[in-house]
Amino acid sequence: MAGGLMADLEAFRKAQRADGPATILAIGTATPPNAVDQSTYPDYYFKITNSEHMTELKEKFQRMCDKSAIKKRYMYLTDEILKENPNVCEYMAPSLDARQDMVVVEVPRLGKEAATKAIKEWGQPKSKITHVIFCTTSGVDMPGADYQLTKLLGLRPSVKRVMMYQQGCFAGGTVLRVAKDLAENNRGARVLVVCSEITAVTFRGPSDTHLDSMVGQALFGDGAAALIVGADPIPQVEKPCFELMWTAQTILPDSDGAIDGHLREVGLTFHLLKDVPGLISKNIEKSLVEAFQQFGISDWNQLFWIAHPGGPAILDQVEAKLNLDPKKLRATRQVLSEYGNMSSACVHFILDEMRKSSNEKGCSTTGEGLDVGVLFGFGPGLTVETVVLKSVPLQ
């Protein structure tokens, strides 16, 4: 009797799991309508924050923006909103209530916009979505943005939700790692993944004693990305664009306090050590070896690349340290240029850009003609997320 029960349980457990690896079945992106030109942003920023008298600081900020490799960004915050909320424009004025009122509405709304596009591309009824993963570093609320998104989209009340708050810039990799586990361990699961980021929590006026805060003001932009992740795609119905082969997360040695953020009465404060690019470039090869040794790959130029674009210095130092062909980070640099640093959403914008440009250029795969690639998320900790991707042939 016991033996029969154990055999039944074993069969039951096996039946619960998918046969194949998790795949990305669709990608959707969204931004607020308000686009900001990076070249003129210092003039706007110092004017709207009543800081035009700080001329030397403005010149420093202009240099930061000029060196950022960003052409434009999108922002929910407009002149009207900032004029109605003067405390948001000061360097350290109590303003959390005003910021929260904005993001608890706008984060799920922008997430819905991206999710609607992903669901449309996927082409299946939204009732087939079994799980939701929602990620944001913009505000906190109960019930969370995952709940709000479920309501906004009209998903089934029984959908299984995971909410990730305050993870930061590495979390575009985190959500893929968790989605992979959900898809592969629940046969038939279809996971809606949404990362939605709004800089209304971090925007503040300049300070000549906290230049690291100004780095964030020069880099961060708003955006949301959504993916549908599932294993065993239905032939001729679902069209995967990437497979999720392997994932890892690690905390870099000697990196305590390199990047951190604190939610305070003044909003989300952002702190950064100068040597973040050095810490990442010094340790990145170890992550690559750990990921690709098992696949017999040791030439990093054989891979297609998606790296979180924390800023141009990180990309430049990674490129130099690994002797990467400059073309490897093309998609990454393009997204940085067109959108800025959108925290967790960035790597999904880059995936979208890569598969679209691969198709337009007539490449043989979604990974710029290559079979295997790497996705890196970098953020507070310093935490690094590594995702090994397999591309899909393009007909």
Curated annotation (Swiss-Prot):
Reactions mediated catalytically: (E)-4-coumaroyl-CoA + 3 malonyl-CoA + 3 H(+) = 2',4,4',6'-tetrahydroxychalcone + 3 CO2 + 4 CoA
A GO biological process held by the record: flavonoid biosynthetic process
Highest taxon of source: Eukaryota
GO MF term set: naringenin-chalcone synthase activity
Keyword line: Acyltransferase, Flavonoid biosynthesis, Transferase
EC number: 2.3.1.74
Pathway annotation: Secondary metabolite biosynthesis; flavonoid biosynthesis
UniProt-listed PROSITE patterns: CHALCONE_SYNTH
Active site (record annotation): C169
Pfam families noted in UniProt: Chal_sti_synt_C, Chal_sti_synt_N
Keyword GTP-binding: no
UniProt cross-references to SUPFAM superfamilies, sorted A to Z: Thiolase-like
InterPro entries found in the cross-reference section: Chalcone/stilbene_synt_C, Chalcone/stilbene_synt_N, Chalcone/stilbene_synthase_AS, Polyketide_synthase_type-III, Thiolase-like
Functional note: The primary product of this enzyme is 4,2',4',6'-tetrahydroxychalcone (also termed naringenin-chalcone or chalcone) which can under specific conditions spontaneously isomerize into naringenin.
Family stated for the protein in its record: Belongs to the thiolase-like superfamily. Chalcone/stilbene synthases family.
Entry protein name: Chalcone synthase 7
